[in-house]
């Protein structure tokens, strides 16, 4: 890899490592606000710290030139910065109690974070990778998918446990739907 490509790739990997640590810190903050789900948030936070360590290992591998890879210029590095800003902003707001700290709200934030991570798809960092580097990228990507699935499952359980009204009328415009009479409307006379 040429030195310019190496420098840019190292900068991106450093930003990804910082992002993973910021997400770990956000989940740790969630665990402090939500004692009933402390284990859930703590486990996610520990995984994010692990991801940061894996990215740091990739940085060291690049510096040691232990493998062949070719950077992919299509990776959107600004997405990393935007997501990190999103994570840090929500953590600040939560600490200042400016946003709700109920489980549903925190799950929603976490879902957005994990969805954004999966959309970034770290495997797009390189057009060609080999060996351990590829394995590390796939580990992070697959564990992110697992996080998204766990969070999605919790959201589904919450949605399905909400009480639902049994007295719903038929939707507007549907046959059999009774319509309210508008007392202000002029009545039509049939003769």
Language-model features and meaning:
Residues 1-191:
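Non-heme di-metal
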């Amino acid at each position: 890899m040429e030195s310019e490509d190496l420098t840019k790739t190292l900068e991106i990997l450093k930003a990804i490592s910082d992002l993973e640590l910021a997400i770990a810190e956000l989940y740790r903050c969630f665990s402090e606000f939500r004692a009933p789900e402390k284990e859930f948030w703590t486990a996610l936070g520990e995984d994010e710290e692990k991801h940061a360590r894996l990215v740091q290992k990739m940085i060291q591998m690049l510096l040691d030139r232990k493998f062949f890879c070719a950077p992919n210029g299509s990776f959107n590095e600004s997405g990393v910065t935007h997501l990190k800003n999103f994570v840090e902003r929500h953590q600040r707001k939560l600490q200042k109690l400016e946003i709700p700290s109920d489980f549903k709200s925190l799950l929603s934030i976490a879902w957005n974070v994990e969805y954004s991570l999966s959309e970034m798809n770290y495997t797009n960092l390189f057009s060609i990778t080999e060996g351990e580097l590829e394995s590390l990228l796939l580990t992070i990507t697959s564990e992110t998918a697992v996080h998204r699935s766990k969070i999605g499952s919790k959201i589904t359980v919450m949605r399905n446990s909400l009480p639902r009204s049994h007295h719903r009328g038929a939707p507007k415009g549907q046959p059999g739907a009774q319509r309210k009479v508008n007392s202000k409307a002029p009545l039509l006379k049939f003769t």
